[in-house]
Amino acid sequence: MAISAGNVHLQTNTSSSIDTDAIEKIQSLTSIPLVLHGSSGIDHTLRRKLASTTNICKFNIGTELRKTFGDNLRKKMDQNPNIYDRIQLINLPLQELKSVTKTVIENITKF
């Protein structure tokens, strides 16, 4: 079941104020696994805590990954103005994207 507890879709910063009391109340009323949409705006430390202490089974973090890719693509294109090949360009930000993806996965994996 998808819930919202202070999180916002398409949030591009990590300043969400998550209502953990609301999450606890919701999970006390249902045995259905919870989904937290808009998780990109939630700090990694809090995501890790929620993953290990609640029945949230899915964190939607697409905006965080798209923002990482887009920000790094812009930066790499500025640093490499002589690269025009689209395959080379699209590969420039992949290392940063892999790093952020790894961090995200590590912080939402149940223990």
For each predicted feature, which ranges?
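Glycine-rich phosphate-binding active-site loops on the catalytic face of alpha/beta enzymes
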Residues: 5-8, 54-72
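Glycine-enriched alpha-helix->loop->beta-strand junction motifs that scaffold or abut catalytic
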Residues: 28-33, 52-59
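Short acidic/histidine-rich active-site segments
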Residues: 39-43, 61-64
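Extended, intrinsically disordered, low-complexity segments
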Residues: 76-111
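Glycine/Thr-rich beta-alpha phosphate-binding loop at enzyme active sites
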Residues: 2-21
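Catalytic cores of alpha/beta
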Residues: 40-55
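Alpha-helix-loop-beta-strand connector modules within alpha/beta enzyme cores
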Residues: 15-36
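Short, conserved beta-strand edge motifs with alternating hydrophobic and charged residues
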Residues: 1-4, 35-38
